[in-house]
Amino acid sequence: MEGFHEVVQTEWGKPLNTMLPIKRLHIKMARLAKGLKKWRKEKIGNTRLQLAITKEVLLQLEMAQELRPLSDQENELRKRLKARSTGLAVIEKSRMRQRSRLTYIRSGDANTKLFHMKANARRRKNYIHCLQKEGGLVFSQDEKEKVVGDYFSEHLGTSTARTLSLNWQALGYTPRNLQQLELPFTQDEVRHTVLEMPPEKALGPDGFTGAFFKACWEIIKDDLLAAINNLFQLHSQGFELMNSANIVLLPKKTDALRITDYRPISLMHSFAKNFAKLLANRLAPHLNSLVSNCQSAFIKKRSIHDNFLYVQSMVRKMHKEKMPTLFMKLDIHKAFDTVNWSYLLEVLRALGFGPRWCEWVSILFRTATSRVMLNGLLGPSFHHARGVRQGDPLSPMLFILAMDPLQRILEFATQMGALSPVPSSTARWRTSLYADDAAIFINPRKEDIDAIKVILQAFGNISGLHINLEKSSVHPIRCDEIDLDHVLTSFAGIRGSFPCRYLGLQLHTRSLRKVHVQPLIERIGQRLPGWKGKWLNRAGRLALVSSVLSAMPTYHLTVFPLAAWARKSIDKIRRSFLWKGEENANGGHCLVNWPTVTRPKDLGGLGIPDLNKFSRALRLRWLWQDWVDTSKPWAGMELPCNDLDRALFNASTRVTIGDGQKARFWHDSWLDGEAPKHLAPSLFELVRCKNRSIHLELRNNGWVAALRGQITTASQVEEFISLWIRLQDIHLTPGTPDTITWKWTANGAYSTRSAYRIQFCGSYRAFRSDLIWKAFTENKCKVFVWTMAREKILTADNLQKRGWPHQDRCALCNGPLETCLHLALLCPFTRAV
């Protein structure tokens, strides 16, 4: 906005008395915040009030025009007021869009009423009417503030003494070379961190968003760099002024009453958050080597599905092979809020983090202060004494480092004989960790249950991460002949069964039934009433269908293919909301058939994902990662891929053989880019073992010995001779691994996008739809033109096909029957316009 940068430049450049870089930055930001508030009040003011006044004056002028001609001054005033009204409406809509948090919808794709409604709904949802304490419910603001203040002062503001410590060498911890983490911060590094900041996230105590830092980088960069370099030198004077946060309480469930039913999210001061993000960016590339493979949260190239697929494969294998086992899900009490700082720093030192890095983490810890925001009002400030902030970019990484020793402790206990080994030969680990979701496989023995209780209690005393066994659960696998009442005598938790939920998905021993998938469909349908489709134009509904309704099943589709009935149910919801804005719509409301709508935009569709093709594209990643990353916990186990998935994968890849140990002789495309089973299909039918490696099949011509029966037909003889000749030129290279290349990307690596796109190979486009989507206009206009190009808008001819009331003649020119072609090009009225 005009004048903004001038105000920032003026306020930022005013002289200061202090020379301490951090205090200088704090004073400048506080002073600038006041200056911008004053400037906004003078420049913009109350937009809602101004907009209401402007509309009222315009209304009076229009009423006057009905009685008499307006004067020149009145016409000029009306012209200016209309321009002013448009500008104020844009500002108000943008402001309400930010408050509504519907950031995936553009301002032009929805009515301002929708943003108002969503903002009010969020406020009502997050408003805390009452809280429960030991004596009953409290309703007044003062009493609620006392309950909240006492709780956080006790849980975050006090630390507990450690009674035990760990022998890090016995657990296999050896210091790594992490000196590069302590290099000086460069201007490019800081600027990259600033550019990564989301522009419209919730404000911290200072009131500045990422958009401000990006827009004013040239003005503020010198002071920002000076403060960060001061922290690099471990001079933290004044940092406590900027390491503050406002804690907002978000309900975990609809009927939240206790303070524990709310999730505390810290809205940090932007400078402290920037510094934490700097450290997080440096640490992120090293996490893969620092954290065991049984843990996948917050680590690049690892996925939550890695944990689920490993556990799912283990459960199914143990059930199939009738191995009695207990699957235990652990509940860690307030994990992020209770981790002990001394323990966390011990973990960092054991891993090889240097003294400067550990001191940076200590500075972030010991200078942290917070205030709880209750219904928009801030409570008193308190100092932190333990835990890591939820909302701090560095906190998730520190937390997984703090959790990782649990896996090593359990493995050490197994080696020492305190726990008996898990019977399955494919079990790489008995533990699966994803942030604070922990799961363990245990043998159904009373001695193991007693031992695990002692180990978990000791881990809680060491780390502050106490396991709540009463809320933990045990799920037996093939334990029908075992006296579980005796085995679980000392276990006070929940005894469950399969299927059960783990990491948000159904963990099962057999195939999923309809009752297990139905909740997913219901959750998708439940999103529609809150959106009020009538306040959205079709482009806005398209954005919601593409970014929300189509994304909701993605987590499920990555592991489980949806049955046809489930896909149809979800498609019905998406189709109805797109065309009518409601959950149910009949065929007459749906202007274009669904297969056309779900094609990519450049192929004549609207770009809404086809769930069947998208699910297959997601599942191909398992086949790709099974090739390129053998360190995955599920490597070598059963994959959630069917024959069609494997056929598409083989057609989409090219294998370059080295030692022939990895590639499969018959299935992989390694022989001049083709698979031998396609070169010799008749011969392939005679093969006994179809999944052997190239190395085994070429050694002593093992592929010939693997043929069962006689080669009798002419086609079999021809294929045998052709394959024999081609194999004579193949020579393996011992010590060189086989490699695989994805055909549909420039860098040869798999991507979901390319796997989805290739499934439309052979499709044609009826018209140059790409010209529509490249046009410089609002999305609602693009969607309308796309519908008209398909000749599907509700002109008279289309109304006639549906049997709906209509006028035969064009309403604009009173000419022939109204059609899309006539309305767009042939109508004299349209051509004149």
Predicted region positions:
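A helix-boundary/hinge signal
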Residues: 1-74, 84-87, 94-96, 100-106, ...
